[in-house]
């Protein structure tokens, strides 16, 4: 299209790391007499495309860690409560992340302790796919993430140690369950990342 339209100069921020592309487009532009400038605002372009670049170079999802802790470095109060240990502004930032990212992942203990919805509460926000890491399928059948109107956006990652009857009940509800080989009696997070990236 660029060649057919008679464009004489093309400015490229950063090269596409996709090995299937491998600079062929740039070569074709140059062969057709088009001036090509590469690397303009390269760092900003790479930052803007970091999610794609991570996936295309590693076949892994781009992961952002969001955590909260009390002033003494704990993730829960003395009573074991972890809900609302952050302020309103921090919670809003968390919901902005949920809106921007494709998925949110928690361990089953978070589901058992807090029964969170893991939805985006920003007006007109987009709900992420909810991923629960649960090696032995201990998720309560009354958990919000497997019962609410967004249950079709829930993935449970488990192992062959999962209770087969519970597995069937969850699948019958339309819950997406990934069964992975266990590593040290837990979900192998390395394999989980590979599986999630392939979706």
Annotated model-derived regions:
Residues 40-68:
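Proteins enriched for Cys/Gly/acidic motifs involved in redox and nucleic-acid/cofactor modification
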Residues 24-25, 32, 50-52, 58, ...:
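Charge-rich, low-complexity amphipathic helices
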Residues 26, 42-49, 91-98:
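Hydrophobic, well-ordered secondary-structure segments
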Residues 14, 49, 79:
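Short, flexible helix/strand-to-coil boundary loops that buttress conserved ligand/catalytic motifs
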């Amino acid at each position: 299209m660029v060649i057919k339209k008679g464009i004489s100069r093309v400015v490229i921020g950063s090269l596409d790391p996709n090995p299937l592309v491998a600079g062929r487009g740039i070569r074709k532009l140059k062969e057709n007499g088009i001036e090509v400038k590469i690397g303009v605002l390269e760092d900003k372009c790479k930052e803007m495309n970091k999610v794609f670049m991570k996936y295309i170079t590693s076949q892994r999802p781009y992961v952002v860690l969001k955590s909260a802790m009390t002033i003494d470095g704990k993730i829960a109060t003395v009573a074991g409560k972890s809900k609302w240990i952050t302020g309103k502004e921090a919670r809003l930032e968390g919901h902005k992340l949920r809106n921007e990212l494709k998925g949110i992942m928690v361990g089953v203990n978070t589901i058992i302790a807090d029964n969170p919805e893991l939805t985006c509460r920003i007006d007109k926000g987009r709900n992420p796919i909810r991923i629960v890491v649960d090696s032995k399928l201990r998720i309560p059948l009354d958990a919000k993430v497997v019962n609410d109107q967004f249950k079709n956006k829930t993935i449970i990652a488990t192992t062959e140690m999962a209770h087969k009857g519970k597995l069937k009940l969850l699948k019958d509800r339309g819950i997406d369950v990934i069964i992975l080989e266990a590593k040290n009696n837990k979900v192998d997070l390395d394999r989980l990342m590979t599986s999630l990236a392939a979706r």
